Design a protein with these regions (language model features):
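Hydrophobic h-region of N-terminal signal peptides that target proteins for export
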Residues: 7-15
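A non-catalytic alpha/beta surface segment that caps or lines the substrate-entry region
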Residues: 37-86, 109-113
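Short amphipathic alpha-helices in soluble, non-transmembrane regions
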Residues: 231, 341-349
């Protein structure tokens, strides 16, 4: 009799699992097929669709809202009420995606396609996968009647990829009470790192570099191109950029990157392991840092970087240029201040005729100290889905909406659930895709993680 009961319950559990997968897939498909690009897309439509999904699972109208700073720029905020055991936890994903042209893809980027073990479509990696997983998980928790110790908030936002109406920034400025939290779990960063099909680690992103661009400009009186002069705006700017290309900012680790190199050095048996451990020391070993700097990813983790990304000059092919400009994009490590970086660029260029002004300023983001309790909880949950996977704090070289939350005093930790092989990164590119198994593994992980965080009392 016990055996029979076991098989009945096992079959029911499998049916429930299949149901949850079907729901998550349907949500994912719906999101992919709503164009949410800045140019012609409609983030509000996607936000309203997700609100309708949550209400169908039992969320009240008062617990799911859609707010927009501008037409087509909607943000959805949903809340599961807890017993008041602490400040809420915020779960964050963005609904907008970068542009995608049909002629660049092998198929329509806004048609959800499953083929050969992959889901295809714009946003499958960045990051409608995570938005779908969060919505599916919140729906499941509501249906199960789960009551957390503190409120759980889900925010799906606009204009993370660009555009004038960044949802997180706007919500913090105008509706902070809706998303204020003890800390945020950001689905746009961190997560399982996989390479060549091998899972390496579960990363918790606790820092990110600040995007900050400068405009370099040289002005000249110009003239007729038949009467050339050595004093040429393009020459002068080129020579200044050549000096910048030979400059390297000093190594500047923070507790997050120091812990990353220390932990990965202990885990890795490869040729870089000894250098990881050496660079994690105080002070970092200079020779080890020099060797690691030869790899773009490690160089970017070790220091602030500045690189020219755009050039313009002249006004006619038969005229000497009166102006030449360059955009230099910098990624600042936490602790490096824009004014100091600007002064260093001016010093390196060494030419008072080259002006340096902020082109796209932003607010530097601090790092978020990672509580031991969060590392341990993430490790336990991760091991339930991917046994034996180590947990490592990390800093990402790109930027996310976590910068606004950290500046506002909300510690933010990137823990993406659906992973992508490092050899198959297609976010922002052609034929974006995610492995079907990775998506469903992420569904399992997010459910376990959100439920565990909602039950835990040790993480402040």
């Amino acid at each position: 009799m016990r055996t029979s009961i076991f098989f009945v319950f096992s079959a029911l559990a499998c049916a429930q699992s299949s149901l949850e997968r079907d729901v998550a897939r349907a949500i994912f498909k719906e999101l992919i097929e709503i164009n949410t690009t800045d140019s012609v897309g409609d983030n509000t439509r996607a936000a309203q669709a997700m609100a309708a999904r949550l209400k169908s699972a039992g969320f009240s109208d008062s617990d799911v809202v859609v707010l927009a700073a501008a037409p087509r720029k909607g943000n959805m905020i949903a809340r599961i009420h807890g017993t008041g055991g602490g400040k809420p936890i915020l779960f964050l994903a963005h609904l907008d995606v970068v542009e995608a042209r049909r002629e660049d893809w092998s198929f329509d980027p806004f048609t959800f396609l499953e083929r050969d073990g992959y889901f295809y479509g714009r946003g499958t990696q960045d990051i409608k996968d995570e938005a779908a997983l969060y919505v599916a998980t919140f729906m499941r928790l509501r249906r199960e009647g789960f009551v957390p110790r503190r409120d759980l908030i889900l925010a799906l936002t606009s204009d993370e990829e660009g555009g004038p109406n960044n949802g997180v920034k706007w919500l913090l400025e105008t509706h902070r009470d809706l998303i204020d939290a003890a800390f945020c779990v950001n689905g746009d960063a961190g997560g399982v790192q996989v390479q060549g099909g091998k899972r390496l680690l579960l990363g918790i992103q606790a820092a990110e570099k600040t995007f900050y661009s400068f405009r370099l400009e040289v002005k000249n009186r110009g003239g007729h191109s038949s009467l050339p002069e050595k004093d040429n705006a393009i020459y002068r700017l080129s020579e200044a950029l050549a000096r910048l290309s030979r400059f390297t900012f000093p190594v500047r680790l923070n507790p997050v990157t120091q812990s990353f190199f220390e932990r990965t050095g202990a885990l890795d048996n490869g040729p870089d392991a000894a250098d990881f451990r050496a660079v994690a020391k105080a002070p970092p070993d200079a020779a080890a840092a020099a060797r690691l700097s030869g790899r773009p990813i490690y160089n970017a983790l070790l220091r602030t970087t500045c690189i020219p990304t755009m050039l313009a000059g002249g006004h006619a092919e038969n005229a000497l240029p009166q102006t030449a400009t360059a955009t230099v994009n910098c990624r600042l490590v936490p602790g490096d201040l824009p004014d100091a970086v600007q002064r260093e660029i001016v010093r390196v260029l060494g030419d008072p005729e080259v002006s340096v002004t902020p082109a796209r300023p932003s607010v530097p983001s601090p790092f978020s100290p990672v509580p031991r309790e969060l590392l341990e909880l993430a490790g336990r949950v991760g091991s339930e889905v991917w046994p034996g996977l180590p947990v490592v704090p990390l800093m990402e070289t790109g930027g996310t909406d976590g910068i606004y939350l950290r500046v506002a005093g909300v510690p933010t930790y990137g823990i993406a659930a659906a992973f992508t092989d490092l050899d198959d990164i297609r976010a922002h590119g052609k034929d974006e895709r995610i492995a079907v198994r990775a998506f469903y593994d992420g569904l399992d992980f997010d459910y376990r993680l959100i439920r565990a965080l909602g039950t835990d009392t040790g993480i402040k």
